[in-house]
């Protein structure tokens, strides 16, 4: 919402991924945009017609999914194809023109990280760290993200103080009934 993610999930199927994303912040996703990285199937489409959503974006939609989604009034369904999900450039308006530049999509070499504390990260903690790093780069201003290995748990963003962003993220986790 407002250029910040309010949910994200990974699952064994699209519906499970969607359910995890929604459970991150069941209030804020109302009226939002939902994006997928693979074809939307009929089971997922049935879930998508329940809430009020502005837009659904995916590489493709099954014929049955499209028939289901067409029944929802004022819903924009955008099929971008697999290449459409590649995000290589950003455009920003500035005084007197626009700034068109290559986006910073570098992931870093996480496998080369060195733990400098006495406690080594467990595999699940390292996976949570990787997901958190991927997500936080999409959150604006004093971004705080809590994640586990397959779900965004809470977001704090847009505050003058990082401490306030942390408080918001912790509150969001608590309100969603999730655990840090």
What would you call each of these model-derived segments?
Residues 1-180:
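ATP-dependent carboxylate/acyl-activation modules
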């Amino acid at each position: 919402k407002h250029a910040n993610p309010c949910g994200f999930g990974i699952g064994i199927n699209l519906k499970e991924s969607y359910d995890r994303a929604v459970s991150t912040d069941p209030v804020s996703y109302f009226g939002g945009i939902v994006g997928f990285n693979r074809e939307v199937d009929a089971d997922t489409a049935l879930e998508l017609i329940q809430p009020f959503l502005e837009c659904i974006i995916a590489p493709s939609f099954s014929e049955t999914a499209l028939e289901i989604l067409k029944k929802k009034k004022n819903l924009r369904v955008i099929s971008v194809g697999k290449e459409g999900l590649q995000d290589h450039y950003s455009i920003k308006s500035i005084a007197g023109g626009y700034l068109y530049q290559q986006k910073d999509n570098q992931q870093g070499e996480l496998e080369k990280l060195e733990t400098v504390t006495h406690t080594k990260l467990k595999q699940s903690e390292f996976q949570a760290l990787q997901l958190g790093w991927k997500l936080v780069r999409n959150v604006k201003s004093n971004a705080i993200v809590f994640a586990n290995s397959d779900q965004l748990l809470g977001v704090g963003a847009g505050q003058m103080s990082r401490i306030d962003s942390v408080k918001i993220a912790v509150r969001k986790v608590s309100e969603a009934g999730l655990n840090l």
